[in-house]
Amino acid sequence: MSKIASEVVATTLNDWYIAIKKQKVDESIKYYSEIKKLFDEMEEDQEVLAYYSLLEERHKMLLHSSRGEPLQKHTYFTEDNQNFITKTNDKLEYNFYLFEAMYEAYNKNYDRAINLYGLAEKKLAEIPDEIEAAEFYSKVSYLYTLVKQSIVAQHYIKNAISIYKRHPDYKCKLATSTMIAAANYADMKRFEEAEQYYLEAIDIAKETKDEFLKAQLFHNLSIVYSDWNKPDKCIESLEKAIGNESWLHSIYYINSLFMMIKELFKIDEKMKAINFYNKAQERLILMENKVYEAKISILYNLYCGELKNNFNNCISNIEFLKQQNELESVDELSYIAAKRFESIGAFEEATSFFNAKIWAEQKMNQVEGIL
């Protein structure tokens, strides 16, 4: 039986990558299943195998971001593979750096991610493809968003949005890019604009009939309402996210439970908050998440029991979040804790949390200096 030409498989890989870039999750899953079978019959070609391995990693990241599946440890981003990739072509080398940067950003290794995005950008200049440019802009913007560099992030994401608007097949990407723009407006305290962008993204998600994306957007919109001090709207948005079946089964469900607990405690709905706290404990047994376990424990100990007696538990969980490089969580929860202890006259304890908040701010500013 004759072997399948590697060029034929490479063409199918290109189609797979287009599906990934369009954020077409079901199509990507279909290609992944079909392409694996082709390799048994393909003539040997190391470059095509490398391309497949890169897309496999990118596919995993798509399932994580767009369906809330756990992200497995990468298997391809090694020094040996990098050395091989640099001897191939600009597109493969660009993808290697881009995908590894995304993975490092996910792991909060921001210095490494920044360096890799810089390498990717140099290779991008050799690739005349505006969709590829939009993909790059959106990923870099997301990194800037994570470290609260909102103005720079907006510059990149507006470029991505402009490109995606010219390509109707990329509506899911347009929605997620609009979501990033909304998040940056929220970080700048421009809440009306943030709300407007989120609602626009939700409308786009409805057009695509992507229920998971819609739930994700409602969850993120709830964060805007929380920061805007609109608890009723925050809770309403969270209910829409939590009520979504695909969101319920994803790793992101615990994020919404955390938000609900925080908001209910904030408005003194203690019994309702404890009810969601119990749901969170059940979920954490099924899906371990040490970061959210610590975050939820902090909230519970700030609002339940004798506050002064809960200091050690709260501060130890803050220290754990610091070790995990959860800068935004340390910043937010340290401030809540500081104000709670300050309200009962426990100024020494409050100072410990204010210092933790300052630490987080300084760390984020260090990242800004690198950027």
Curated annotation (Swiss-Prot):
The keyword Repeat applies. Inhibited by PhrK, which prevents RapK-ComA interaction. Disruption phenotype: Deletion of the gene has no detectable effect on expression of the srfA operon. It is found in: Cytoplasm. TPR repeats lie at residues 7-42, 93-130, 175-208, 215-248, 254-290, 331-364. The keyword Repeat applies. Its main location: cytoplasm. It holds the Pfam family RapH_N. GO terms for cellular component: cytoplasm. Keywords: Competence, Cytoplasm, Repeat, TPR repeat. GO terms for biological process: establishment of competence for transformation. Belongs to the Rap family. Involved in the regulation of genetic competence development. Inhibits the activity of ComA, a transcriptional factor that regulates the development of genetic competence. Likely affects the activity of additional regulators, in particular Spo0A. This is Regulatory protein RapK. It comes from Bacillus subtilis (strain 168).
